[in-house]
Amino acid sequence: MRGGMGNMQKMMKQMQKMQKDMAKAQEELAEKVVEGTAGGGMVTVKANGQKEILDVIIKEEVVDPEDIDMLQDLVLAATNEALKKVDEITNETMGQFTKGMNMPGLF
């Protein structure tokens, strides 16, 4: 029985360390900034690791009052690219904590 309690305490310490490490990794992710671009760099969207849009940069020459739809499409494409990159770095960073566990959609 004693060995079981020792193992339980060891497992609890490991879980606490993992929680602490995960929290630190999430803080680091929040500080990372990724960019998504569209139209050959005519539109750039910057997002952080928490999927917050930080900046939208639109080059003047892409603004055509006659073709707002194109500009909207470029902003949408750049935003989606930035968010996809956030997902990639999140999965890469947080994946180290879930190796071997089947937890789809956790992050």
From Swiss-Prot:
Residues 8-17 have a biased composition (Low complexity). The gene is yaaK. NCBIfam families: DNA_YbaB_EbfC (TIGR00103). It comes from Bacillus subtilis (strain 168). This is Nucleoid-associated protein YaaK. InterPro entries: YbaB-like_sf, YbaB/EbfC. GO terms for molecular function: DNA binding. Pfam families: YbaB_DNA_bd. Belongs to the YbaB/EbfC family. Keywords: Cytoplasm, DNA-binding.
